[in-house]
């Protein structure tokens, strides 16, 4: 079964019939569920901390939220990587798109699925907590919009670079088995680094769900522009400067395992 992921270095729009291909539909459903799993646990950890403590701006609270994000993303990537590639993030999908690893048609379907998954998870979280309003993301005092854009771009560059190295690179070898942990742990580390400044979004879907359900839109554009810039640059750098030209057209890890591999 093909997931429709293409060799790199060739931007492709894709065919209209790709949107209704069973493999594409399965991949989009996988992205929806994986993103919902991630956002529910990630935003839930923030709500839980706020429920227990009046002041969440403590070092212990930051570590707890970072760990929750790391574990949630690791699981979300693991459950989706053999079906859709385990993007779980519109910025990661964009990085794969500019590197020629997914078609535009598939990318658009992934984006829709990821955003819907994030909204569904946040709605379920609000219902399950008796109507608690998701806090979402905000810039700390003294942090300007463009400072946050730069921070988001740098953090998401690292996230996308790690994804390329452990999931997409044709020569990733056995390192591919730790891809979910590698990506998850880096996300957690970035939450520790950037959380006190802008919440450390790195994922437009992760930010969009709470923004819509909690109706908090201030500085929202920052959490789209920064991650897309960082992920797009990482995709170009890894695709053109790291992967040898001879390996660029080699199919990669977004193929499901054969039954005997389970």
UniProtKB/Swiss-Prot annotation:
Span-the-membrane segments of this chain are 27-47, 61-81, 104-124, 148-168, 175-195, 223-243
UniProt KW keywords: Membrane, Repeat, Transmembrane, Transmembrane helix, Transport, Vacuole
Question: Superkingdom, according to UniProt?
Answer: Eukaryota
Topologically, how does it sit relative to the membrane? Multi-pass membrane protein
- Cellular component terms (Gene Ontology): membrane; protein storage vacuole membrane
List where in the cell it is found: Vacuole membrane
SUPFAM superfamilies reported for this sequence: Aquaporin-like
Q: Which GO annotations describe the biological process of this protein?
A: water transport
Role of this protein: Aquaporins facilitate the transport of water and small neutral solutes across cell membranes.
Its recorded name reads Aquaporin TIP3-1
């Amino acid at each position: 079964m093909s997931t429709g992921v293409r060799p790199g270095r060739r931007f492709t729009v894709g065919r209209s019939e790709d949107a209704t291909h069973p493999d594409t539909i399965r991949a989009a459903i996988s992205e929806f569920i994986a993103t919902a799993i991630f956002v529910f646990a990630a935003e839930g950890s923030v709500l839980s901390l706020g429920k227990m403590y009046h002041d969440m701006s403590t070092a212990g609270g930051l570590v707890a939220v970072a760990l929750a994000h790391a574990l949630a993303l690791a699981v979300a990537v693991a459950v989706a990587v053999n079906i859709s590639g385990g993007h779980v993030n519109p910025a990661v999908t964009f990085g794969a798109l500019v590197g020629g690893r997914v078609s535009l048609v598939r990318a658009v379907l992934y984006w829709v699925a990821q955003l819907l998954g994030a909204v569904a998870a946040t709605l379920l979280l609000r219902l399950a907590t008796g109507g608690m309003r998701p806090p979402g993301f905000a810039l700390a005092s003294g942090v300007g919009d463009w400072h946050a854009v730069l921070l988001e771009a740098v953090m998401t560059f690292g996230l996308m670079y790690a994804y390329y190295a452990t999931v997409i690179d044709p020569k990733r070898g056995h390192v591919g088995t730790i891809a979910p942990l590698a990506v998850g742990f880096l996300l957690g580390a970035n939450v520790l680094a950037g959380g006190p400044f802008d919440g450390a979004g790195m994922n437009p879907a992760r930010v969009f769900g709470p923004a819509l359900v909690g109706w908090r839109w201030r500085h929202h554009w920052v959490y789209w522009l920064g991650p897309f810039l960082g992920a797009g640059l990482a995709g170009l750098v890894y695709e053109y400067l790291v992967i040898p030209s001879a390996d660029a057209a080699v199919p990669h890890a977004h193929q499901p395992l054969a039954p005997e591999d389970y």
